[in-house]
Amino acid sequence: MAEEHKHEESIMEKISEKIHGHDDSSSSSSDSDDDKNSASLKTKIYRLFGREQPLHKLFGGGKPADIFLWRNKKVSGGVLGAATVSWILFELLEYNLLTLFGHISILALAVLFLWSSASTFIHKSPLHIPEVHIPEDVVLQLASGLRIEINRGFTVLRDIASGRDLKKFLLVIAGLWVLSKVGSSCNFLTLIYIATVLLFTIPVLYEKYEDKVDDFGEKAMREIKKQYVEFDVKVLSKVMSKIPKGAFAFIKKKD
């Protein structure tokens, strides 16, 4: 009887192990299915301009990104305030850059010189003027990044000029036309200041209302693509049909 009882217990243990093993496998498979579904949902979310990284990483992920996205409000406000004061001085008050630099330098050097000279008479320690130098690695990084961006711009311009992508060509022409109109209505300094203000406001507002902006951008892109298809059928296809095919063959051979 004892052996039969042990045999029944071993059978029950095997059955329970199989049941628990099936539950574990089913739960793990369901978890993996949930992970896959959540991952697929994440990939389906539309991001403006096909963005795949957070906005902070797109700005470099360092101190410049913290400044533009107002992670440090004092520094961001100071930079924007300095840009505003500079624009007021040079644009509204029509102050000359060299004149301003000369006056500030004269005032600063005079104060430092008088304080250092008078410190021995008033029995106070002279001012400690720190050494100022530009690190070489920072300059090399900036130069390397600027070189890469300039070369990338040259590559894009070459592709556009070669006649391979008519859509990109029309977009660039429209952008340059808008830029020329804006440049004719305001000078270069005002344009730089407007770009600075936009750089300090649009990214942080976009980060705050990201989902709403992306949803609106998705609808806008659908409408733009729809209008472009109609424009392509009604206008571009007719224009391209009138251009001799030998011209494009000549361009391809030249490339």
From Swiss-Prot:
Topological category with respect to the lipid bilayer: Multi-pass membrane protein
InterPro entries: Reticulon, Reticulon-like
UniProt-annotated stretches for the region Disordered: 1-38
Membrane-crossing segments per the record: 75-95, 97-117, 186-206
Residues with N-acetylalanine modification: A2
GO cellular component, one term: cytoplasmic side of endoplasmic reticulum membrane
Swiss-Prot/TrEMBL keywords: Acetylation, Endoplasmic reticulum, Membrane, Transmembrane, Transmembrane helix, Vacuole
Record carries keyword tRNA processing: no
Biased amino acid composition, Basic and acidic residues: 1-25
Keyword Magnesium in record: no
Gene Ontology biological-process annotations: endoplasmic reticulum tubular network organization; response to bacterium
Origin: domain of life: Eukaryota
Compartment annotation: Endoplasmic reticulum membrane; Vacuole membrane
UniProt xrefs under Pfam families: Reticulon (PF02453)
Ranges of residues in domain Reticulon: 64-255
Protein name: Reticulon-like protein B3
Organism (species): Arabidopsis thaliana
